[in-house]
Amino acid sequence: MEKIIKNGKLVTDSEIFDADILIRDEKIVAVGKEFNESNAEIIDASGKLVLPGGVDAHVHLDLPMPGTVSSDDHYTGTKAAAFGGTTTVIDFANHDLPSLIDSFNVWQEKALPNVAIDYGIHQNFTRFNENTLKE
């Protein structure tokens, strides 16, 4: 199924211009005018700005803390982000296990089935040793 966002003002990092957006299989495939509308769902963006999705490069989702866990889990936090126009988050993952890679994999297995938007992970080095150096 195709969608066309029509009549909006597209905002980029350098300009604002009139254009339509053609979406196929949930991906933007073209920006321009005069797309074939015969089989497309039309979204009228007249009088509206059309912006790219935001990226939040530092979030804490389902993060254990002494005696509690952060308020949003991976689903509620990414769903709330989407409602605010954020389409990608980079989540903090604890380095709780002896291996950085194991900590990363455990966090990813916990998160990925539950996220509602694009998702990445960053970690800190809470300890540095020979194993960490090898990884």
Give each language-model segment a name.
Residues 108-135:
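Metal-coordinating catalytic core of metallo-dependent amide/deamination hydrolases
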Residues 11, 17, 67, 96-97, ...:
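Short strand->helix junction
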Residues 1-4, 9-52:
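Histidine-rich, glycine-flanked metal-binding segment
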Residues 38-39, 70, 115, 121:
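Glycine-rich, flexible loop/turn motifs
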Residues 45-114:
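Metal-associated gating/positioning segment near the N- to mid-region
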